[in-house]
Amino acid sequence: MANLASKLQPWWLLLVIPFLFVSNTYHCVNAEPQVPCYFIFGDSLSDNGNNNNLATEAKVNYWPYGIDFPKGPTGRFTNGRTMQDIIVQLLGFQEFIPPFATSRGQEILKGVNYASGSAGILNDSGQHLGVRISMNMQLSNHQSVISTIVEMLGNCAASKLLGKCMYAVQIGSNDYINNYFKPEMYNSSHLFTPEQYAAYLIEQYSRQIKTLYNNGARMFALFGLGAIGCTPNAIAVHGTNGSACVEKMNTAAQLFNERLVPLVDELNSNFTDAKFTYLNPTGASAANSLGFTVANASCCEIGSGGDLCIPGSEPCGDRSQYVFWDAVHTSDAWNEVIAVEAYDSESKAIAYPFNVQKMAQLPNNNDADGDICEMGENSGVTV
């Protein structure tokens, strides 16, 4: 994994020493972030504490979660950082984006993380696990944050700021893992073929992305689904019939991803004042070629029939060797692989039509559109 060392310096220094080199390639000391703010929508892959006080089985504010995070267990579903945490670092932010549940005051001007464990594109996905904040609810929460920003800055300045932010959306796994592939609890697999279900999800997802656009977003990082059939939980529950992974789950997720690419083309064509890119988390190099020796087992001890770490249990010693932290969620080490790929990969199979770094560097229409503030304070974001 030496090839990643040049991308990120020891990451925990981010929380200790301000204004340092996060990357010796991309950032300078005292440099501003490449975008002024970063908003995150998603599920447990991005959740950093929004579920902590909810009545749900999908919360992990206990040890050994956060064993490699300076603040310990925060509600992140991994041993250290999420993929979004690492992208935030690469973009040059000096602090991680706060969860909506605890974000206050001026910090929301740098962005908010709305992600919620067990959440899906569909409102009912994950409901058997308890309370969660679906994508539609996350959009409602974002509207409340916009209202606060407008109160702080005024409508015009708020509109200009929000138009320069990056919006990361990483959701959809629970619509399969905790919906379609639980036919004893949900009827989606009885109503839809995999092809029909992917089309239905994309239809709902497209509306949600357009809602973000209508609320002032202009820079979108849209993450596809990972290999959901390769998680230790999927293998244990569904079996593989001799394959390395549960192929029916991976195939279903790929149908979603295959529809997300043309959606990005459509959005870029229809909304020329915005930028949309697709990021493929399954496109990274093979785990063993990067030094990972365990790709199909969890690092921490899992309870019988479950997918989360047993509270207080002792995890594996060398976590850098494991792709998976628990039976569903990936380790800090693997999250870094995927995040760096999303940030600077030149492969169109991984980042299409451009990577996160390139998108952040593209001209922003809000930079040239200074007339909006001259139109009066009523111009700008509609809330």
Short names for language-model regions:
Residues 1-35, 347-348, 352-383:
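Terminal membrane/secretory targeting segments in land-plant proteins
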Residues 37-41, 45-47, 84-85, 110-116, ...:
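Structural recognition of the beta-strand scaffold that forms the well-ordered cores
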Residues 39-40, 50-74:
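Peri-catalytic substrate-binding/gating loops that frame the active-site cleft of hydrolases
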Residues 63-203, 207:
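Conserved SGNH/GDSL esterase-like catalytic core that processes O-acyl groups on lipids
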Residues 171-282:
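Extracytoplasmic, non-cytosolic globular domains
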